Amino acid sequence: MDSKTVPTLGETLKQLGMLQSALAQQLTETLELPLEQAFGRILKQPAITESHPFLNSFSDNLNEYLEQTGKKNNALCDSIIQCPAMQQADHSGILLDDEIFLNNLFFSMALSSKNIPYGLTIQCSTVKCISARAPLKGPLFLKDGNQPVRLSDLSNSQLKSRSFCNLPTPFQISISAPADQQDSRWKRLREMWNTKTFTCAEDAFIAINTELGKQIKYATGTEIVFLDERFTSFLAAKQLLNAQLPLADMIFDATLRSLILNIKETTIDSDDNFVLGHDLTDFFYFKSEQKLELLAIENCTTGAELILKRRSDGTVLARVGKRELVRMLEDGRLFCDRFLGYFVRCFGTGLKALGGTSQQDSVGLYQSILRKSNTQLQFMNTPFENLCFRDELTFLAGAPFFEGIDSSLLDSINQSSTDNLGSFIELIKTRKVKQLIGNFQSCHYLLKNAVKNKERQ
């Protein structure tokens, strides 16, 4: 694709189709639907009776986590059972970021169309604090028009090597003032949050999003509950102890672990991959003082312990049995990588993952890795196998569906105006998806990735 040419939606879908992209098939089947009808397609669940015990187990684990963290919400757990889906499009960020706001507005609208009162969003808190430098991007940076807004007084040098979950604790929000001091929204936020100290950055963002999300709930009737990768770690810990699930074998059985990781590496290096990154870690990240370390896992020569080594230099970081591994996950010393995160949240729970452009083909590659591994060395029972390899485990949702909307119309849904938001929802819900999605520019980087991957081969 010529880097100077912006392809039409039809051209984009054709090129994605040539890559056998799941994203192309999804959109082709959805484009002619009005948005309010597309919600039903997006949230549609496969008829797999085996999902019920796994889904109930997820709901129980979610209930326990919410209770432990002081956020008990039985209605959310009931909503998950009614409509097994979660939104996973977000990096850690607050709802004043346009993309994050639109992701969660879309999710809330979709759930509301099915009369579901609560939805669950998992934000990726293992994201780097600085993801781009010109202009600065990351979870602690916003833009208000052309004015930069910082959410922390930490310097760029302090943030450079950190992941969001590695920010200093306790954590204090410090919202810088845009040049326009008359902006009541920023003034109100500074008054509300700048004096407060939180246990950690993740808790700060959850508190802010819970408050800002009231506007979405007011407009749709469905409330979004925000969690982060600490919940994914908690879920992995619970699944390690569940004999009905294969996770413990995947981690502790040296032969099986090596098989899965080798197939994963081969898949990432293959022609089929234009979505997965090349930073390889053995299932987990180890949380050091300033950053997340990539791991290499080995079995001890005696006993059932694992040796966790820093991948870059072989330094031994820990020796762990199953119980100690569980404690490290629960204590926040270990985080799941992207592959394992999807495995514990969606592959073995019955939940559909709603997310962004790259997720749609990433999940297919992850399924391929697991299917090839299970074919060569059977480690799944039949109910889990049926659940893991079900169709439509993921679906595109969120901000991409708003790309074709006039920017002035998007500007009208200012966070301070619930009336504007309600009017916006009424305006768009009867429009066809193809009218809303525009040229679908958010996926053009995937086409460029495919070209680069082909050149590298």
Model-derived regions: residue spans:
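Glycine- and acidic
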Residues: 84-94, 194-199, 344-354
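Aromatic-residue-lined binding/catalytic grooves and analogous aromatic/hydrophobic interfacial grooves
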Residues: 2-5, 9, 182-317, 324-331, ...
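Internal, well-ordered alpha/beta segment that forms a basic, Gly-enriched binding/recognition surface
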Residues: 120-211, 215, 222-226
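Catalytic or ion-translocation cores adjacent to nucleophile or general acid/base/metal-coordination motifs
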Residues: 113-169, 331, 343-344, 359-428
